[in-house]
């Protein structure tokens, strides 16, 4: 009898947790709403649909920040490789500026994680916005070059798109 009561209590608790968890899940309609607010809705929908199965908003923010930081780190390594490989002085100056921007962007993304963890959507928003500015500044710097590494341009555009998604999500999070 006691075992039966424990099973019932366990099942009741499990059902309660499932109901609570599902009430915070992001629906495909909400994903569309998020993506409609970005500068590149088609990129956003493709990204969210391939990465997520109805996460909650904080999980969605974390995974988006994870992807953004991974891409920024990859871009930073590529930039350092280009500089180390030898380029003309003008290109070296532009790529060096990009390295500085990406070092700063990665730092801003690390702080965005901290704000997310503490439930501070506004703080996350400010740090993601700063990271987006870094990618944008790098794009401006390299567009002036005669010969540009396409992976730097493509990665910077992807980072801008990912930051756009994170910014929309941050606006949906609580403000501290």
Swiss-Prot record:
Known tissue expression: Highest expression in flowers. Expressed exclusively at the pollen tube tip.
GO cellular component: apoplast; pollen tube tip
GO molecular function: pectinesterase inhibitor activity
Keywords: Apoplast, Disulfide bond, Glycoprotein, Secreted, Signal
Residues making up the signal peptide according to the UniProt record: 1-25
SUPFAM superfamilies noted in UniProt: Plant invertase/pectin methylesterase inhibitor
Origin: domain of life: Eukaryota
Cystine bridges: 35-44, 98-138
Any single biological process term in GO: pollen tube growth
Location(s), subcellular: Secreted, Extracellular space, Apoplast
InterPro entries, A to Z: Invertase/methylesterase_inhib, PCW_Enzyme_Inhibitor, Pectinesterase_inhib_dom, PMEI_plant
UniProt KW Disulfide bond keyword: yes
Residues bearing carbohydrate: 154
Keyword Coiled coil: no
Family from the record: Belongs to the PMEI family.
Record comment regarding domains: The N-terminal alpha-hairpin extension is required for pectinmethylesterase inhibitor activity.
Oligomeric form and interacting partners: Monomer and homodimer. Interacts in vitro with PPME1.
Function according to Swiss-Prot or TrEMBL: Inhibits pectin methylesterase (PME) from flowers and siliques. Inhibits PME from leaves.
Protein name: Pectinesterase inhibitor 1
